[in-house]
């Protein structure tokens, strides 16, 4: 699927409008829908990194030679942590974009991993992509909920060092937003306030008939398919395959990433779209990738650390 988004960008001493969302100089969103018609720029989520809103407005990106110098001279873990600390100290608008690797350190399995796929097929007879599709939910809700409750509805998981470090960074006034692909709500449990959940949350559930709200415990404790007292089936507020992302959540994520002077991407291989394409909206020169394995964007990053996201962030955030 290919997503196109229209952004409007303008700057003044008092406010900035990105994606039709007005910001003050302190990064507070002051108005949704104030688009500046004088500076339209059409950008696609899967465009090359060089196509960014700020580049279109004449702001210069860091050169390849400078990027390589930062990466190549920081060879060991301690040096890279020092470099990450310096980046954080010089930044005012940090955004974190996270994936499944953040949650796996809390004991939550990654259903897209080789082990996760094997478990799904072995236990339920279908791959995760089919089990978690809208079509499967409608046609075989009994199997869907058996899989969902067994492997995704993890209400007993606790925040880890990465969640704690990000909440601390937000409390310090450095971090403006967490953009996550995870549905477990652990960022909020750790204390983060401004969280954009791209794929929804297990903690929000609604009756498909009357729209009544139910928490995760109700769904978990309900035997078989969860039903509302009105008789309607309850659907978790998680984005299934074949479903679109919430446009308001996507807009907020894009706006914050576009305004960021530092983007930390952690616990993701950057291969799941459209979430991975959000990195293309960043136009600064402090792109940090923290993942145990390499990603397609490593050559674009100013700093790459192949290690545990919790270990790295807890060492860097003081």
Model-predicted regions and their roles:
Residues 24-29:
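Intrinsically disordered, low-complexity proline-rich regions
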Residues 3-6, 11-13, 19-23, 37-38, ...:
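N-terminal amphipathic/hydrophobic targeting modules at extreme N-termini
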Residues 30, 34-38, 60-62:
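Ser/Thr-rich, low-complexity intrinsically disordered segments
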Residues 42-44, 54, 58-318:
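Conserved catalytic core of sirtuin-type NAD+-dependent deacylases
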């Amino acid at each position: 699927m290919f997503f196109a988004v229209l952004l409007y960008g303008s700057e003044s001493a008092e406010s900035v409008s990105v994606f039709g969302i007005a910001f003050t100089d302190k990064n507070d969103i002051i108005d949704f829908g104030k688009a500046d018609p004088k500076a339209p720029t059409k950008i696609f989520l899967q465009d090359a990194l060089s196509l960014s809103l700020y580049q279109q407005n004449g702001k210069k990106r860091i050169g390849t030679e400078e990027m390589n110098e930062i990466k190549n001279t920081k060879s060991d873990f301690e040096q890279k942590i020092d470099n990450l600390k310096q980046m954080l100290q010089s930044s005012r608008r940090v955004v974190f974009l996270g994936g499944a690797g953040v949650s796996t350190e809390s004991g939550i399995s990654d259903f897209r991993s080789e082990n996760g796929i094997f478990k799904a097929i072995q236990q339920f007879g279908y791959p995760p992509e089919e089990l978690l599709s809208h079509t499967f939910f409608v046609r075989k809700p009994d199997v869907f909920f058996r899989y969902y409750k067994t492997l995704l509805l993890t209400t007993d998981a606790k925040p880890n060092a990465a969640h704690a470090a990000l909440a601390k960074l937000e409390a310090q006034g450095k971090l403006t937003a967490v953009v996550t692909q995870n549905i477990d709500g652990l960022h909020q449990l750790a204390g983060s306030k401004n969280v954009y959940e791209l794929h929804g949350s297990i903690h929000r559930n609604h009756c498909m008939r009357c729209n009544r709200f139910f928490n995760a415990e109700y769904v978990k404790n309900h035997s078989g398919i969860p039903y509302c007292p009105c008789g309607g089936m309850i659907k978790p507020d998680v984005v299934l395959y074949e479903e679109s992302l919430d446009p308001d959540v996507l807009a907020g994520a894009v706006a914050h990433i576009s305004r960021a002077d530092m983007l930390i991407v952690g616990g993701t291989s950057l291969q799941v779209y459209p979430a991975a394409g959000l990195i293309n909206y960043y136009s600064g020169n402090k792109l940090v990738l923290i993942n145990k394995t390499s990603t397609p964007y490593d050559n674009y990053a100013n700093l790459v650390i192949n290690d545990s996201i919790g270990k790295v962030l807890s060492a860097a955030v003081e």
